[in-house]
A protein has these predicted regions:
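N-terminal ligand-binding/catalytic initiation module
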Residues: 1-106, 114, 124, 268, ...
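Adenosine-phosphate binding glycine-rich loop
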Residues: 8, 224-310
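Short helix-loop-beta connector
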Residues: 120-127, 149, 209-210
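Conserved beta-strand elements of the Class I
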Residues: 128-129, 288
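Glycine-rich Rossmann-fold phosphate-binding loop(s) that bind the pyrophosphate
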Residues: 133-134
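N-terminal Rossmann-fold NAD(P) dinucleotide-binding loop
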Residues: 137-138
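NAD(P)-binding Rossmann-fold cofactor-contacting core
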Residues: 147-170
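Rossmann-like adenosine-cofactor binding region
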Residues: 175-260
């Protein structure tokens, strides 16, 4: 059995590779080419465990990803999100490979936001805000820089030390001007990415400039929320999956519960955009929101690409 560690993945693929892969994956998802049961969630003491199976119809493999989400302990220096992806031969069910899932998860999630940004953010977007300072936040920044000419990044965290450390890391690795931000900076920002486990909205509509694009990837349970209802009501909302968002997108679930917004107001699933490439032109001058909960086909598509490159 092949075993692939996180540190090996970066040597095989770039973020641009992943964005192209995930864009095609969304089109294939729209065409119904994947068998993908609803993600199962199990609560355990101190955290959440997720299981995500997927099979490409007539494909060579099927995958099952297991993800654990725990708040990092100050005593045990564990990561918040840890995962593994099992790859099986679809002809005989044999286990072919086991991939560390953390880097794949971070890269494909960043890439999904990159795809949405490619279609909905203003082409000359230069200013980015990132909420969160973990691995998911880094790949959000990385993907934004692949699809837009980002010159300045404002970093937001509840912990000033974390925002400074992350800013320095981004500046050094990605060669871009990154600095801790304050809410007033959002009036300058063209694109916002949120990658936090927040249970309270991070900012409000009044904080934003007109025509901003937001990628919200942090909330995956009904009680989690990053984006306020007033923003959702005043934005073109795109989702990775309407079905999954009704179960897992806390921002949207709470907006429907507590405001006049309804799921019928969703503009489109991202797959319909990548497949048809015609709706995004209506939204470039408007606020847009891509709400992603993550889908199993993204892991399968990326592991397929990795196996081809090995």
């Amino acid at each position: 059995m092949l075993s692939v560690k996180d540190h090996e993945i970066r040597s095989l693929i770039s973020m641009s590779d992943v964005i192209n892969c995930i864009e095609q994956g969304f089109s294939d998802f729209y065409d119904g080419l994947f068998t993908m049961p609803q993600r199962s969630t199990m609560e355990v003491e101190g955290g959440t465990v997720l299981s995500m199976p997927c099979y490409r119809k007539k494909g060579e493999y099927f995958t099952i990803k297991v993800v654990s989400v725990f708040q990092p302990s100050t005593k045990i220096q564990s990561k918040m999100i840890q995962s593994s992806i099992l790859i099986f031969n679809s002809k005989d069910g044999s286990l072919k490979a086991c991939f560390d899932g953390d880097e794949i998860t971070a890269m494909r999630t960043g890439a999904a936001s990159g795809v949405a940004t490619k279609f909905f953010a203003a082409p000359k977007s230069k200013f980015l805000a990132i909420f969160g300072t973990g691995a998911q936040a880094f790949t959000q920044v990385e993907a934004m820089m692949c699809v837009r000419p980002i010159e300045k990044i404002f970093v937001f965290s509840r912990n000033l030390k974390s925002s400074k450390t992350f800013s320095n890391s981004v500046s050094e690795i990605l060669t871009v001007n990154a600095t801790p931000g304050i809410l007033a900076n959002l009036k300058e920002v063209d694109i916002i990415c949120t990658a936090t486990p927040s249970k309270k909205e991070l900012f409000n509509l009044s904080n934003l400039k007109e025509g901003v694009h937001i990628n919200a990837i942090g909330s995956f349970k009904s009680d989690m929320i990053e984006i306020s209802s007033d923003i959702i009501k005043n934005s073109k909302t795109i989702v990775d999956s309407v079905v999954s968002s009704k179960k897992e997108a806390g921002d949207l679930i709470q907006a429907e519960k507590n405001s006049s917004w309804e799921y019928e107001n969703i503009f489109a699933e991202l797959g319909s955009i990548t497949k048809n490439k015609k709706y995004h032109k209506e939204c470039i001058q408007q606020n847009s929101l891509f709400k992603s909960v993550g889908l199993g086909f993204q892991d399968l598509a990326l592991t397929e690409l990795l196996l081809k490159k090995m």
